[in-house]
Amino acid sequence: MNTLTPTRRRGTALRLAAASLGVILALSGCVQSGRTTHPDNFSGELTCPVEPDPSITTSARIAWQAIPNGDLVVKDLQLLEACMPEANISWLKMNSGGDVIQAFGSDSLDISQVGSSPVVKAASPPLSKDLKVIWISDVIGDAESLVVKDPSIESLADMSGKTIGVPFGSTAHYSLLTALGEEGLSDEVGVINLATDAILAAWQRDEIDAAWVWEPTLSELLAEQGHTILSSEASAGLGAPTFDLIAGTDAFITANPEFMRMWTLVQAEGTRLLNEEPELAATSISVQLGVEQEDAEKLLDGYIYPTLEEQAGAEYFGGDGLATALTSTAEFLETQSGIDALAEDGVYQEMPYGEAIEEVTR
């Protein structure tokens, strides 16, 4: 598998350098510091970081997940609405990659936040949805981790005979399968499918010994005498990087090139805020996730946020790095019965859609 090595953001290594693109202006006055009202009730002035385009009248159904990345910043500040005032933007909440797969399968979405494993599953038989990856929201590090209850367990090697809960089809599931396979424990550990909101209850009822999960459930388990023994950053070191991506249907993307150009500029601004002004971005994260500002800032340290310029490079959309990672993910999931079968030749390699990124970086 191909291991991708983007620059680590502040808190886990050096902060990403700012993308000095003339098309992106400094965003000022967008965030009201200390704002606690839900963004759906936000009545402040909407500010677009680029020249708004009222000629775009696209109707877009966009799904989001409670993951601390630029997509939440974009949603909270209503940047898409500000930059495309005549477009019809509908935001839908999804709780997991499995929910996203079902929604794409029923043609209920145009664009969605989705993990690298679920998007591969959606593109594979029997669903075989024609999806394109249009943005990398983050590369997952310590934000997804294996938390165990027994204090005597210090490593994955101690987990033989234990039961681990994880949302099936998620990036956490992929990381867990990778780690178990590397340790030779695939047949020695019980793995059960639990949604994130069911994991804490199963933990408290002693139905599971451990869980590979993300925030806020991760912190809840740690508060219940749990401790971390492994993370998705370690799985990436084994050649299995995981991502939170944004994907869209090929039909929607092909039919709406101007929308995709503006959408890409807006996502780039969300990422810029995370890397250059993390305290400002954390205000949006705190509102969307319903957590304290300080806690929101800490959440950001578990992820890497590739800039627009980095995403345009050979390691991602400008070369075959992302395509190779998606292909490797599919091949691994097929060996672990995570998907029924591999898609036809070329499907995973053609999933990255870099046209809009290339256009706005010219």
Q: At which residue positions do the language-model features occur?
A:
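Bacterial signal peptide processing site
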Residues: 31-34
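Pocket-lining segment of extracytoplasmic ligand-binding domains
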Residues: 118, 188-191, 197-290
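Conserved C-terminal helix/tail region of periplasmic/extracytoplasmic solute-binding proteins
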Residues: 326-362
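Short, glycine-/small- and polar/acidic-enriched structural segments
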Residues: 36-186, 191-193, 209-212
